[in-house]
Amino acid sequence: MNKNLLKLIAVCGTACFLACTAPQKAETEKWSERMARSEMQRFPEPWMIEKAKKPRWGYTHGLVVKSMLEEWKHTGDSTYYEYAKIYADSLIDADGHIKTMKYLSFNIDNVNGGKVLFDLYAQTGDERYKIAMDTLRKQMAEQPRTSEGGFWHKLRYPHQMWLDGIFMASPYLVQYGATFDEPALFDEATKQILLIKSKTYDLSLIHI
């Protein structure tokens, strides 16, 4: 038999043996868990998310950290909860002020991070979280609006409604309304969704 063929068979056989005998990852670990743990490994401190150079209150941070809280609820693994709490505690000071947030910028991006505070407040009763949530609620009460009542995305984007602004603000307002008995916020959130739908949903823009 050709010597090269024998070598190839030997290499393949060794590879198969190693694959069969190597420790296998538990089949019970879901992809959501793998992804969450991967993110925590990439960003040991949650403020590092999105390769941030220093702590900041950001909407992408809010998205990832809120996802960690959902993973905690599904798995019961407190590692995810603690990761979220570390983020909030690194950005909210002893008086409940949100560090790095520029209130007068009226930036809806600020609100997305606030979604993580409901669970933290429910678990701890820490008034710092409530003060921070109230600050974001106050921002939305004072948010500049279009002539039809739609929230501007930011002060520096006058008269502009953005779809991701709906994603960031409407769920926050609804949860705030449900948590602190302010049902008028349900109507406000619905109004914003219907208004942007009337401006952006157009089947004639679909081309196949």
Kindly label every feature range from the protein language model.
Residues 23-92, 127-135, 139, 143, ...:
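Low-complexity, Ser/Thr/Pro/Gly-enriched N-terminal "stalk/linker" regions
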Residues 1-27:
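Bacterial Sec-dependent N-terminal signal peptides
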Residues 206-208:
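Conserved small/polar residues in nucleotide/adenosyl-binding loops
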Residues 77-118:
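Mid-chain, structured segments of secreted extracytoplasmic proteins
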Residues 111-168:
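Extracytoplasmic mature domains of secreted/periplasmic and thylakoid-lumen proteins
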Residues 57-73, 105-122, 162-178:
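Well-ordered alpha-helical segments within folded domains of soluble proteins
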Residues 121-125, 173-198:
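Basic phosphate/pyrophosphate-binding loop/patch that engages nucleotide-derived ligands
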